[in-house]
């Protein structure tokens, strides 16, 4: 099965290419912390030879509580992203929540992300597609993997086939998510690159009084399971002090564990992609 290649600068993204990392922090907490986090990712990915795109949100529009930290907002967020690009020369991915934000974000960021909760919002999907930017489509927790085809079709009908699919877990009763490993193969049949958001797959939505809980201790186990499916890449969030992070700390990898974590996943990715295809249908 031919796999579509998406290019972001010098990076080639495809299910049969070396693993690409979309990595960073959940939300921009400050310019200095964003610089610190990106610097560590750049250092580690350059050492390991992993193609890298920096990830952070400028606004978390779907927090559990009205008092929860949301981020610096659109204007300040774009300024921070521009500073990061200038300092480190890395591509950037961030999420868009409203149609009016799409064009503004696409002027600065190399990949724009369609949030899982909003992935069926046609006006937002079309506005993002019309920017011509590469789009990372998060699979909603309530969607079957085969339903992602409808979102792909909306983008293509709007004139954009520069698309990536991203698994982030499925609702499993209340306050819990599970990852259906069979879903990766279903989405790969669409021939677009498929990523695994291991961070948010670890969430326990509403698991704490006013925010989501998480299962950080299992991040390596779940990441290995995902990468074993021969994917285009991994989506990962890390933090210098996860216990005090302003959003999704319970799911975030400790930043000082980034190198040993990625070293194992790179070896696994290389091993899996060295195997010949076996037709089992």
UniProtKB/Swiss-Prot annotation:
GO cellular component, one term: cytoplasm
Record-linked InterPro entries: Aldolase_TIM, DAHP1/KDSA, KDO8P_synthase
Compartment(s) of residence: Cytoplasm
Recorded metabolic or biological pathway in which this protein acts: Carbohydrate biosynthesis; 3-deoxy-D-manno-octulosonate biosynthesis; 3-deoxy-D-manno-octulosonate from D-ribulose 5-phosphate: step 2/3; Bacterial outer membrane biogenesis; lipopolysaccharide biosynthesis
Presence of keyword Transferase: yes
Reaction it catalyzes: D-arabinose 5-phosphate + phosphoenolpyruvate + H2O = 3-deoxy-alpha-D-manno-2-octulosonate-8-phosphate + phosphate
Pfam families found in the cross-reference section: DAHP_synth_1
GO biological process: keto-3-deoxy-D-manno-octulosonic acid biosynthetic process
Protein name (database record): 2-dehydro-3-deoxyphosphooctonate aldolase
Keyword entries, A-Z: Cytoplasm, Lipopolysaccharide biosynthesis, Transferase
Record-stated family: Belongs to the KdsA family.
Main location per the UniProt record: cytoplasm
EC numbers for this chain: 2.5.1.55
GO molecular function: 3-deoxy-8-phosphooctulonate synthase activity
């Amino acid at each position: 099965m031919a796999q579509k290649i998406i290019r972001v600068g010098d990076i080639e993204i495809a299910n049969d290419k070396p693993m690409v990392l979309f990595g960073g922090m959940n939300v921009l907490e400050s310019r200095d912390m964003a610089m610190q986090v990106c610097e560590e990712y750049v250092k580690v990915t350059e050492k390991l030879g992993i193609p890298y795109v920096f990830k952070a949100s400028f606004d978390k529009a779907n927090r559990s509580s009205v008092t929860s930290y949301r981020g610096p907002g659109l204007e300040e967020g774009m300024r921070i992203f521009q500073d990061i690009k200038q300092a480190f020369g890395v591509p950037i991915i961030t999420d868009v929540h409203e149609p009016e934000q799409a064009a503004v974000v696409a002027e600065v960021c190399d990949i724009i992300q369609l949030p899982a909760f909003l992935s069926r919002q046609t006006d937002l999907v079309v506005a993002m597609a019309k920017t011509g930017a590469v789009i990372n489509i998060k699979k909603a927790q309530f969607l079957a993997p085969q339903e992602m085809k409808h979102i792909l079709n909306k983008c293509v009908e709007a004139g954009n086939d520069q698309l990536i699919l991203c698994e982030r877990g499925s609702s499993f009763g209340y306050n819990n998510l599970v990852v259906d490993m069979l879903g990766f193969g279903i989405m790969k049949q669409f021939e677009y690159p498929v990523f695994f958001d291991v961070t948010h797959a670890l969430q326990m939505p509403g698991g704490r009084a006013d925010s989501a809980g998480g299962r950080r201790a299992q991040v390596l186990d779940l990441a290995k399971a995902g990468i074993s499916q021969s994917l285009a890449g991994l989506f990962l969030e890390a933090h210098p002090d996860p216990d005090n992070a302003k959003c999704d700390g319970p799911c975030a990898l400790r930043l000082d564990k980034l190198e040993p974590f990625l070293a194992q996943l790179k070896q696994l990715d290389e091993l899996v992609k060295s195997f010949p295809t076996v037709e089992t249908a």
